Regions:
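N-terminal glycine/serine-rich phosphate-binding loop of ATP-dependent small-molecule kinases
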Residues: 1-86, 134, 183-186
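Glycine-rich phosphate-binding/catalytic subdomain of phosphoryl-transfer
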Residues: 55-207
């Protein structure tokens, strides 16, 4: 089987094909430049991230796809999963600017920090109430890529934990205070991650 490996990093988006254990067809493209970088806010157009990822991946024939992404980034979407914000990078510091301080317990698997997505969402709630009022769904970068391919907002628990919204002990997601108040990040007990199967633009491959 041919496995397509994609790593969406902060500097480059990297690709490789694993076939029988050997890596081939390696390629990389620069991660899109930020649309906003003012020393506090660091935002990237999500459409540009998807376009760069799929432009190369669509040319590669594979049986399935493995995706890793930078963590601590997120975006908010409306009731139809349409983005309300750009991708807000781990380099964003709006929570510090808004003086957000949250109690983040050990069960979250992370700690309070300026780039914690949960703290960033709280900053948006305080500073942009009109935008927050429209928010119905929270995505990590990984879960938005999965949604683009499968229609499901799903990610691995390691990505979920980095958001600050996940209880790693009970494997449950916390309310994001967005409209739906439903579980937006999923894991399957027993193998520590999300089991997702769908068909998308990656050559009809299986995710």
């Amino acid at each position: 089987m041919k496995h397509l490996l994609i790593d969406i990093g902060s500097t480059n988006i990297k690709f490789a094909v694993s076939d029988g254990g050997a890596l081939s067809e390696t390629e990389k493209t620069p991660f899109p430049a930020p649309a906003v970088d003012d020393g506090v806010h660091f935002e990237v157009e999500i459409s540009g991230i998807l376009a760069k990822t799929f432009a190369i991946a669509d040319k590669i024939d594979s049986d399935d796809v493995f995706i890793s992404t930078q963590m601590h980034g997120y975006l908010l979407a409306d009731s139809r999963s349409r983005p309300l914000t750009r991708y807000i990078s781990w380099q964003d510091r709006r929570a510090a600017e808004a003086q957000v301080r949250l109690f983040v317990g050990k069960e979250s698997g992370t700690s309070m920090k300026d780039n914690l997505p949960r703290a960033g969402v709280e900053a948006i709630r305080k500073e942009q109430p009109a935008l927050f009022a429209q928010a119905e769904e929270f995505f990590t970068l990984g879960s938005f890529v999965a949604h683009a391919l499968t229609g499901r907002n799903v990610t691995h628990i390691t990505d979920a934990a980095a958001s600050g919204y996940y209880d790693v002990k009970r494997r449950l997601s916390r309310p994001t205070r967005c409209g739906r108040r439903r579980e937006l990040l999923y894991s399957q007990p027993g193998h520590g991650g999300a089991d997702v199967h769908g068909r998308g633009r990656l050559c009809g491959g299986r995710l």
